[in-house]
């Protein structure tokens, strides 16, 4: 048995196991955060129709990136009808929470930020899930390579000095 290939095989298998464990952690965190996002959005119970979306999807609760993006874009469009920018809204003055126009603009801005943050969060979840899956597959491949190195080490005699 060739000790050098045997040792390399062990190292490769250990790295593969670490990859699988890390990948499983990524996947676990990804699914946990995805469930958290979906449940949090369902608790808010904001429906597409509440924000001006018409059609067959109007009664659906915003609970995914597609709906959040669609509605955030709609809120942004509606907000720009109030004023093209925050600076234009204030007209060189300070924010006045008693002004209904400024208050509506601020509420739209908050809702828009909430929805775009949800879109970004779902994207990060997808990245975590994809990265975790890749790490698991890579870990499995490394373990298989380590096993092949073991078999190879058995067939090669130890070099004599």
Segments (PLM) and residue ranges:
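Short, aromatic-rich amphipathic segments at membrane interfaces
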Residues: 100-136
């Amino acid at each position: 048995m060739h000790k050098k290939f045997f040792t390399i095989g062990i190292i490769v298998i250990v790295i593969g196991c670490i990859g699988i464990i890390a990948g499983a952690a990524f996947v676990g965190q990804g699914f946990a955060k995805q469930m958290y996002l979906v449940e949090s959005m369902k608790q808010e119970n904001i429906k597409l129709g509440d924000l001006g979306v018409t059609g067959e999807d109007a009664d659906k609760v915003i609970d995914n990136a597609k709906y959040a993006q669609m509605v955030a874009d709609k809120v942004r469009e509606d907000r720009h009808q109030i004023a093209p920018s925050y600076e234009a809204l204030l007209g060189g003055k300070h924010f006045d929470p008693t002004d209904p126009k400024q208050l509506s603009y601020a509420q739209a801005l908050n809702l828009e930020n909430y929805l775009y943050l949800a879109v970004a969060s779902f994207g990060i979840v997808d990245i975590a899930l994809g990265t975790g899956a890749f790490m698991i597959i890579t870990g499995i491949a490394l373990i298989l390579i380590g096993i092949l190195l073991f078999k190879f080490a058995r067939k090669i005699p130890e070099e004599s000095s």
